Amino acid sequence: AVFTVRNNXPYSIAPGVLTGGGAAASTTGFQLAPGXSXNVNVP
């Protein structure tokens, strides 16, 4: 599955991704600038 994380705030955010059991997500944390988005692939 692919989740898209979008920052609608006027400041940078640092989202984190945690999966329960099994394989880990390919990206577990990152910084996202205002108005930017990133895709996270999860098992």
UniProtKB/Swiss-Prot annotation:
Please name the InterPro entries in this protein's record. Answer: Osmotin/thaumatin-like_sf
Q: What induces or represses expression of this protein, per its UniProt record?
A: By phytoplasma infection.
Recorded superkingdom: Eukaryota
The family this protein is said to belong to? Belongs to the thaumatin family.
Name the record gives this protein: Thaumatin-like protein 1
Q: Which organism is it from?
A: Glebionis coronaria (Crown daisy)
